[in-house]
Amino acid sequence: MICKKKFLSPIINLFHSIIINCKGMYITLRYMFKPKVTLNYPLEKGPLSTRFRGEHALRKYKNGEERCIACKLCEAICPAQAITIEAQERDDGSRRTVRYDIDMTKCIYCGFCQEACPVDAIVEGPNFEYATETREELMYNKSKLLHNGQVWEEAIDFRIKKNSQFY
């Protein structure tokens, strides 16, 4: 006598595998007609948050004068101790920076330096593409930071105005 379970088992397995394959094809077809989620990165870039923290920059006033007043609050508040500032007093009694260095290999992009600055001199801009070939290129000096400020001034100014309630 042939056991019914042994006879029906391959038939049940066949129907079960057909159902599983149909479910998989249904899911695949459903996603084929939805808009793509993946971006082709170098050619397409997704939107950044207005509070995104990217490459650092030093800003200038519209008349060309540097904003940094050498108060050294950013250097004091930096938890990674990545900022080094040397100041010099001017003839009119005000102070300005002679040396402003940021070691980007130490920086943790916390944004404390930006929050501590009373004149919005140091900011973290919208640039996230700054890969380098050597570590020395990640040691930003004052001229590199001022250059970043000039390049990204419009975007930085827009972000600060848009997020003024958060600063």
From Swiss-Prot:
The annotation note on the cofactor reads: Binds 2 [4Fe-4S] clusters per subunit.
Q: Which cofactor does it need?
A: [4Fe-4S] cluster
Keywords of the record: 4Fe-4S, Cell inner membrane, Cell membrane, Iron, Iron-sulfur, Membrane, Metal-binding, NAD, Quinone, Repeat, Translocase, Ubiquinone
Q: What is its EC number?
A: 7.1.1.-
Principal place where this protein is found? membrane
Q: Name one GO cellular component term.
A: plasma membrane
Record's subcellular location: Cell inner membrane
Name any one GO molecular function.
iron ion binding
Lipid bilayer topology: Peripheral membrane protein
User: Cross-referenced NCBIfam families, in alphabetical order?
Assistant: NuoI, PRK05888.1-4, PRK05888.1-5
- Similarity field: Belongs to the complex I 23 kDa subunit family.
State whether it acts alone or in a complex, and with which partners, per the record: NDH-1 is composed of 14 different subunits. Subunits NuoA, H, J, K, L, M, N constitute the membrane sector of the complex.
Which HAMAP family does the entry mention? NDH1_NuoI
What is the designated name of this protein? NADH-quinone oxidoreductase subunit I
Q: Which organism is it from?
A: Ehrlichia canis (strain Jake)
